[in-house]
Amino acid sequence: MATIHRLPSLVFLVLLALGVCSARRALLTLDAGYGLGHGTGGGYGGAAGSYGGGGGGGSGGGGGYAGEHGVVGYGGGSGGGQGGGVGYGGDQGAGYGGGGGSGGGGGVAYGGGGERGGYGGGQGGGAGGGYGAGGEHGIGYGGGGGSGAGGGGGYNAGGAQGGGYGTGGGAGGGGGGGGDHGGGYGGGQGAGGGAGGGYGGGGEHGGGGGGGQGGGAGGGYGAGGEHGGGAGGGQGGGAGGGYGAGGEHGGGAGGGQGGGAGGGYGAGGEHGGGAGGGQGGGAGGGYGAGGEHGGGAGGGQGGGAGGGYGAGGEHGGGGGGGQGGGAGGGYAAVGEHGGGYGGGQGGGDGGGYGTGGEHGGGYGGGQGGGAGGGYGTGGEHGGGYGGGQGGGGGYGAGGDHGAAGYGGGEGGGGGSGGGYGDGGAHGGGYGGGAGGGGGYGAGGAHGGGYGGGGGIGGGHGGNVP
């Protein structure tokens, strides 16, 4: 009997609760509709509200959509011709999009906010478009602008806690993508009938940047590995390109410039860095590669052709460069904890080579209006030096813990000179030749030998303990 008496009370409480919920929903809907219904182009609001509006002498419209916990999505368009914009806000984020156009032009933009935001915008008297997407805790920015009959577009995507940036103008475009905790940057610019493009991608905790500029064509690429960064760029009235890639905890940079053609490449290994660049009215190129904890640098310059190469081993560094109105080249390679340097210069031909052994260093260089070459190699804890000028050549080799071996040759006119130096354990050898002369020097253990020759003579010196 008591249960029967409780039924009317339970029914009354249920009906009362339903009435309160319905009244609350009606009030919220009225509030949201009032806040969003005043955009010129109309708008629609989700859970957290959004804003959209558009206007123009021709036609304009905008819409915005907000996702869960979104601070809002913004979209708007204006134009004497046509303009439109749309924005989307994701989880706990905001997306921004806008477009504008004048004359018969049109502008379109898209912004998508992943968790915590994205932005996109476009402008253009011709046509402009932009796109932006934000990943988790990140922000993406994209924009495009164009004038005349030109067009511009930009795209970017932000990864987790990262950001990407892309811009484009004229006939240019850019893209940027950000990885986990990183950022990617990409941009392109072009003038006249030119075209420019760039791309950048960021790995975990790293960043990549790429950009291109050019009245002709310019392009760049950059990619960042874990905790590292890569940067690449190209510039040129003719064509220029660059590439850079960064390994773990390292960085690589590459760039190219040239009225004719220029290119560069740089790659960084673990904890190291490589840099390469090329410049030239004719053609110039460079390459640099860095090994573990080391770095390599290479560059080339030349009205004719110039090239250089540098490679770095573990904890070491190598550098190589070439310069020349004719042709110049250089090479350098390094072993563990050491360094090698090589370079070449010449109006005719010049070349150099250097390689470094463990904890040592080798140096080689060549110079000459005719032909010059040099070679240097370093043994364990030692160093070798070699150089050549004119029609001469030199060689130097360093032994175990040796102060080094030194060799050099010089020659003038039709003359030729050569020199050789060899350093033993803890010792040093020196040799040199000038004119039509030659010299040799050999150093024994803890000793040193010296030899020299001039004219058409020769000399030899040796010291053994």
Curated annotation (Swiss-Prot):
Which terms does the UniProt entry file under GO BP? cell wall organization
Subcellular localization(s) per the UniProt record? Secreted, Cell wall
Residues in the signal sequence: 1-30
Tissue specificity statement from the Swiss-Prot or TrEMBL entry: Expressed in young hypocotyls.
Region called 8 X 22 AA tandem repeats of H-G-G-G-[GAY]-G-G-G-Q-G-G-G-[AD]-G-G-G-Y-[GA]-[AT]-[GV]-G-E, residue ranges: 205-380
Placement of sequence repeats on the sequence: 205-226, 227-248, 249-270, 271-292, 293-314, 315-336, 337-358, 359-380
Q: Give the chief site where it resides.
A: secreted
Q: Keyword Cell wall biogenesis/degradation: yes or no?
A: yes
The alphabetical list of record keywords is: Cell wall, Cell wall biogenesis/degradation, Repeat, Secreted, Signal
The entry's cellular-component GO terms read: extracellular region
Q: Superkingdom, according to UniProt?
A: Eukaryota
- Copy the domain comment: The repeated domains of the protein form a beta-pleated sheet configuration.
Q: What does this protein do?
A: Responsible for plasticity of the cell wall.
Protein name, please? Glycine-rich cell wall structural protein 1.8
